[in-house]
Regions:
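Detector for methionine-enriched segments
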Residues: 1, 17, 59, 169, ...
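Generic detector of short alpha-helix boundary/capping microenvironments
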Residues: 3-6, 37, 153
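Conserved oxyanion/phosphate-binding beta-strand-loop segments in alpha/beta enzyme cores
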Residues: 1-18
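A conserved helix-loop-beta module that forms one wall/lid of the active-site cleft
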Residues: 22-132
């Protein structure tokens, strides 16, 4: 325990800030509260990025209601790999990554074989807000599956690593992987 505290203090002395401090001391102070719904929703963020000319994974479709779940076969078509995400999820919770498809079943990136019904259940769980910030009703987005380059294999854990550049008052102040 004391070793962990020592390590944390050493990192802090080097100017390395943890995510908790960032979230507590900087996010509320430098971001307008009324803009949170834009950045907390992956669908809105993706649409804004596209409008700004930023390349993002192709979005195949959005499911907003239980009734729309029956549109899943139409949305994914013949694609053998895709990703389903909660629009307002955080920390990777609720994300289902399909790597292959065969004989009416799907294979996740972890190697688990699941049925179409299990995917529908996951979509339903997303819509009820099981994975959303604050537990509110949500939407599911289905999009292109990004496969990371092998260079990231030794430094990333579960999922596709993303590189984030944190900009404060117009200046890049930190980055994270």
């Amino acid at each position: 325990m004391f070793g962990l505290i020592k390590r944390w203090k050493a990192l802090s002395a080097l100017g390395i800030m943890g995510i908790n401090r960032r979230n507590a001391d900087y996010v509320p102070k430098y971001n307008q509260r009324h803009l949170y719904p834009i950045v907390d929703d992956k669908i809105i963020t993706k649409q804004r990025a596209i409008e700004a000319g930023i390349h993002v994974p192709e979005m195949y479709g959005i499911i907003s209601t239980e009734k729309e779940i029956e549109r899943l076969p139409e949305i994914i078509g013949e694609r053998s790999d895709f990703v389903i995400k909660p629009a307002q999820g955080a920390g990777g919770d609720g994300i289902l990554v399909i790597a292959d498809r065969f004989e009416g079943r799907y294979k996740t990136v972890s190697g688990r074989i699941i049925s179409h019904g299990e995917i529908e259940h996951q979509l339903s769980s997303i819509l009820t807000g099981l994975y959303s910030l604050g537990g509110h009703r949500d939407r599911a987005l289905i999009e292109y599956r990004v496969t990371p380059d092998q260079i990231f294999k030794s430094i990333s854990y579960e999922g596709v690593p993303d590189i984030r550049i944190i900009v404060l008052m117009g200046y890049p102040v930190m980055a994270m992987l």
